[in-house]
Amino acid sequence: MPNSTGKIAQVIGPVVDVAFPINGDLPEINNALTVAKKDGSQLVLEVALELGDGVMRTIAMDSTDGLQRNMAVQDTGGPISVPVGKDTLGRVFNVLGDPIDGGEAFGPDHRRDSIHRDAPKFEDLNTSSEILETGIKVIDLLEPYLRGGKVGLFGGAGVGKTVLIQELIHNIAEEHGGISVFTGVGERTREGNDLYFEMKESGVLENTAMVFGQMNEPPGARMRVALTGLTIAEYFRDVEGQDVLLFIDNIFRFTQAGSEVSALLGRIPSAVGYQPTLATEMGQLQERITSTKKGSVTSIQAIYVPADDYTDPAPATTFAHLDATTNLERRLTEQGIYPAVDPLESSSSALTPEIVGDEHYKVATEVQQVLQRYRELQDIISILGMDELSDEEKVVVARARRIQFFLSQNFNVAERFTGQPGSYVPVEETVKGFKAILDGKYDDYPEDAFRSVGRIEEVVEKAKKMGFAPDDQNTDADEKPAAQAAAN
């Protein structure tokens, strides 16, 4: 049966009402409609509401400039569908799956999947909790990511979000053979452009598909672009059996676009002006991000918090879905510690003995305790100086500073800037290194030897290059009293 044809009844900004014959087949909710504009371009509309008498209210995916009443509108017979598969890697798309990188377009025979899909069924889910090793010490030790989990990435401008994202993409591709999908939702076009060229230069673009719906685009495009990126990621999980990293920057803009669309559709707003369907829309997106028996989609979502108000409905609704948070702190960048992840503010639900093991959990909690004690002592140090501390407190400060520096490491994607080779550190090596520092085995080593290194063995090598010769009697500090270690 041919798909029905209607006519534009009215245009209100990005909202277009389309009248179809009452005795004909009406398009379903979420169906894509097309309008041939006079300039030769084609505008896609998505059905949002049925107003009655054959009139459907739709949301435009691009500018409605040039539309007129009574222009013909064709029902495509299905939702927006986007190209999927290995050919999407290294390419950049818009919300409709059209390439925007100047490359070759996909033919009509290429596989396309609908962006509106159900979450995986219960029987298809992988119920085991498995850690996704990133090779980044501070993440793997203190806020481990769950395979198929969701991570919130917090940080202001210039604290290293982009470099951290690039390193995660690099490590997942190199060590796990995984695929990444980057989705830019409602952010600056310039930032997306810069990210594309940076990823191209660092060599990670070939393992990445990129989808953008930037802040200059209509709210319909910004609301649906996250689903476009997720659909591409789901193909690699469900068909290729891959472990996929899905980056969403910024998940707040997804909510913001939904709020705009809701108001345009005439819905009564809820708390603080947000859409009444906020929790439903967020749930429909987040529940598709999960592990199945075939593969996994692990999501890392940059989150903007309006006015730093964590009780705002938009971030508060997102938090309910997160398994871990990674907080980037400007104070650490000022100290030259990269990645600038705050080890005390970041957290993960996976940091339990049942998931990471007893030794990992014990070392991680001891590291947090030492860093917390150091933070408490900093006020005393800044006012009275180190001399007023007890011998035991001096040991805590010394070890905390070494731990803080050892949490930093060089990134592979930053090697062309720093001239230093990057390092991928397995979880076992990370735990071993921090356990040795906590045990006092490296109390005598200079602090600078711990900066931007990978494994603990690199600390020894760096110290030797600095002219440091460790005393044999200090190599096993378990036998020394803490006060004596501080005195040395």
From Swiss-Prot:
Its EC number is 7.1.2.2. ATP binds at residues 155-162. Gene3D superfamilies: 2.40.10.170, Bovine Mitochondrial F1-atpase, Atp Synthase Beta Chain, Chain D, domain 3, P-loop containing nucleotide triphosphate hydrolases. It comes from the Bacteria. Keywords: ATP synthesis, ATP-binding, Cell membrane, CF(1), Hydrogen ion transport, Ion transport, Membrane, Nucleotide-binding, Translocase, Transport. GO terms for molecular function: ATP binding; ATP hydrolysis activity; proton-transporting ATP synthase activity, rotational mechanism. This is ATP synthase subunit beta. It comes from Lacticaseibacillus paracasei (strain ATCC 334 / BCRC 17002 / CCUG 31169 / CIP 107868 / KCTC 3260 / NRRL B-441).
